[in-house]
C-alpha cells in the first residue's frame, strides 16, 4: 500500500529563550584626551530586555558622567563639568564624553562581553570575556582621545 500523504517527522519546538537578567559590572577607567587625563570607576547596569541603562563614571571623588534611561522613555546624559544635560530618544543620539560611543544598550553589552566595537581592542581576556579594553578614537571636535577599561566585577 502506498501512503497518500507523508507526515513530517516530529520536530522539537525551539525552547523559549529565558529572559536575560540585567548585567551589572564595574570597571577601572582611564582617560587621555583634550580634556586632560584621569582615572576612576565606571559602574554599569544594562537590561537588554527593556533597554534600561545606567552608567556612572566617577573620578577623584566626583561624578564625571551619569547616563540613564530606557528604550520606552529615552535616555539622559549629565556631565556636570561640561554643564551638559541632554536627552534623546536613542542612546546613539547622545554624546558620551570620556567613553567610546555606542548606538544602543545591546551594542554596549556586545562591547563589554566580546570587545567588539569601533576602535576597541582587547588587551587581556579570561573565561568571562574581555578583562582589559582599550579604545582609541576622536572626540566631536576631532581631537584624539583614549579610554582604558579594566573589569573589576561582572554579574549576570
Question: Model features per residue range: what roles?
Answer:
Residues 1-43, 121-126, 154:
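N-terminal leader/targeting segments and the immediate start of mature chains
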Residues 5-7, 22, 82-83, 89-101, ...:
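Polar alpha-helical coiled-coil and adjacent low-complexity
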Residues 23-29, 36-44, 51-55, 73-75, ...:
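One face of beta-strands
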Residues 28-34, 60-62, 80-82, 140:
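Hydrophobic lipid-interacting interfaces of membrane-associated proteins
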Residues 30-37, 54-60, 109-116:
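Short, solvent-exposed secondary-structure boundary motifs
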Residues 44-53, 104-110:
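Short, basic/low-complexity N-terminal boundary segments at the transition from targeting/disordered tails
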Residues 50-103:
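An acidic-aromatic
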Residues 106-156:
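Gly/Pro-enriched, hydrophobic low-complexity segments
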Amino acid at each position: 500500500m502506498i501512503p497518500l500523504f507523508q507526515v513530517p517527522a516530529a520536530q522539537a519546538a525551539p525552547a523559549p529563550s529565558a529572559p536575560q537578567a540585567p548585567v551589572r559590572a564595574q570597571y577601572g577607567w582611564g582617560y587621555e584626551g583634550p580634556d586632560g587625563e584621569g582615572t576612576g570607576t565606571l559602574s554599569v547596569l544594562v537590561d537588554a530586555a527593556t533597554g534600561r541603562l545606567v552608567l556612572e563614571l566617577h573620578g577623584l571623588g566626583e561624578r564625571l558622567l551619569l547616563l540613564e534611561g530606557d528604550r520606552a522613555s529615552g535616555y539622559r546624559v549629565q556631565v556636570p563639568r561640561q554643564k551638559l544635560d541632554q536627552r534623546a530618544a536613542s542612546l546613539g543620539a547622545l554624546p558620551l564624553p570620556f567613553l567610546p560611543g555606542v548606538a544602543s544598550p545591546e551594542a554596549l553589552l556586545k562591547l563589554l562581553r566580546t570587545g567588539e566595537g569601533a576602535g576597541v581592542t582587547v588587551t587581556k581576556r579570561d573565561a568571562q570575556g574581555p578583562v582589559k579594553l582599550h579604545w582609541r578614537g576622536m572626540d566631536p571636535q576631532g581631537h584624539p582621545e583614549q579610554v582604558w577599561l579594566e573589569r573589576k566585577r561582572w554579574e549576570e
